[in-house]
């Protein structure tokens, strides 16, 4: 699904992510992206640590990463690869639109390294749908389909 408005990039470190995503601590939920195949697929990496603020209340004696944050991390990975591939000088913003078929299979806890596999399964104009799978140590912990829209800074929603 490549076109003339895309550039070749195979990985993105935290600085590259900060350059394209509006999220910041504590809501930037990916640390790095690897295995980037254009705007079609990639793997986000989230190193889960006990220092994250949501563990204070979810749950104090048994810290578990909230499922909604796992889905958000998958969506950030999908959004980031869309934005990283753009060659246009106009900044874009990705708006999360839908979550479908979300399933949570096992808890994610501090110390886990969350791999967020995203693959574009559909695109129409500026709206893309991604199949997402989150894994820890090769075991599927969550999955969902997410849809998002890219909006260019000077366009109206």
Swiss-Prot record:
InterPro entries xref list: FabA_FabZ, FabZ, HotDog_dom_sf
Active site positions: 58
One MF annotation (Gene Ontology) recorded for this entry: (3R)-hydroxyacyl-[acyl-carrier-protein] dehydratase activity
A Pfam family the protein falls into: FabA
Catalytic activity: a (3R)-hydroxyacyl-[ACP] = a (2E)-enoyl-[ACP] + H2O
Gene Ontology annotations of biological process type: fatty acid biosynthetic process; lipid A biosynthetic process
Entry EC number(s): 4.2.1.59
Keyword annotations: Cytoplasm, Lipid A biosynthesis, Lipid biosynthesis, Lipid metabolism, Lyase
Major location category of this protein: cytoplasm
Subcellular location: Cytoplasm
Record flagged with keyword S-adenosyl-L-methionine: no
Single GO cellular component term: membrane
Function: Involved in unsaturated fatty acids biosynthesis. Catalyzes the dehydration of short chain beta-hydroxyacyl-ACPs and long chain saturated and unsaturated beta-hydroxyacyl-ACPs.
Family: Belongs to the thioester dehydratase family. FabZ subfamily.
Protein name: 3-hydroxyacyl-[acyl-carrier-protein] dehydratase FabZ
Organism expressing this protein natively: Brucella canis (strain ATCC 23365 / NCTC 10854 / RM-666)
